[in-house]
Structure formats: structure tokens, C-alpha cells
């Protein structure tokens, strides 16, 4: 099993804005991410051009949601910001925010040693 860690409130700020049905779908996909030996690409994909940033992919009633994350020490999935995707390309602002949050996570981890 993979452990999911929520870094600060970035994920929850996104999650709390969703309807109950969307929250249920997100919970289901997060469960798959924790238990699947190999996470299906339908739910999980590395973002090209990033240093270890992934997106968790959630689709519900024609709407597409993305939640950024990364691995730490092999098994832990750290959840960052999420957003509703409205076009084919991931918005550069959302991607830049995720990279900034990922760097913030690892910077804080280094300081704690």
C-alpha cells in the first residue's frame, strides 16, 4: 500500500469546493492510487518536462479534475493543488503552482533534518 500525505491545505482547499459526488469520485481514485500495484494510467500520469511531478486524473460526468502530486521515498504520494481542467492543455499557472508547492515541500523537509 502507498501512503498519501497531504502537504498543508492545498489539496483540501480544492476538495472542499467540490460537490459530494465529485468528492466521492476523488476518494475512489485516491483509494486506487493507494492500493493498486501498478496505478492505471487512466488515473495517474507523470507530467513531461517536470522533475517528478505527477497528476492524479479524475473524471466525473464529463468534467475533468487534476490533482498534482509526487513521490517521496518511493511509496509516499504527496498531494498538492487540484483544479478542474477545461481544456486539453494543463494551464501553465496551475503547473507552475504545483512545481512551487513541490519545491516548498522538499525545502521544508530538508530544513527539518
Which residue stretches match the model-derived regions?
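Basic, Lys/Arg-enriched alpha-helical interface segments
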Residues: 1-64, 73-77, 85-113
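ATP-dependent carboxylate-activation loops
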Residues: 80
Amino acid at each position: 500500500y502507498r501512503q498519501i500525505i497531504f502537504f498543508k491545505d492545498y489539496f483540501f482547499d480544492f476538495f472542499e469546493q467540490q460537490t459530494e459526488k465529485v468528492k466521492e469520485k476523488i476518494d475512489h481514485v485516491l483509494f486506487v492510487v493507494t492500493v493498486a500495484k501498478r496505478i492505471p494510467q487512466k488515473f495517474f500520469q507523470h507530467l513531461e518536462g517536470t522533475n517528478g511531478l505527477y497528476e492524479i486524473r479524475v473524471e466525473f460526468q464529463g468534467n475533468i479534475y487534476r490533482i498534482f502530486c509526487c513521490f517521496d521515498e518511493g511509496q509516499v504520494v504527496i498531494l498538492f493543488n487540484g483544479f478542474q481542467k477545461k481544456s486539453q492543455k494543463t494551464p501553465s499557472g496551475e503547473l507552475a503552482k504545483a512545481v512551487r508547492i513541490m519545491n516548498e515541500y522538499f525545502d521544508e523537509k530538508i530544513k527539518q533534518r
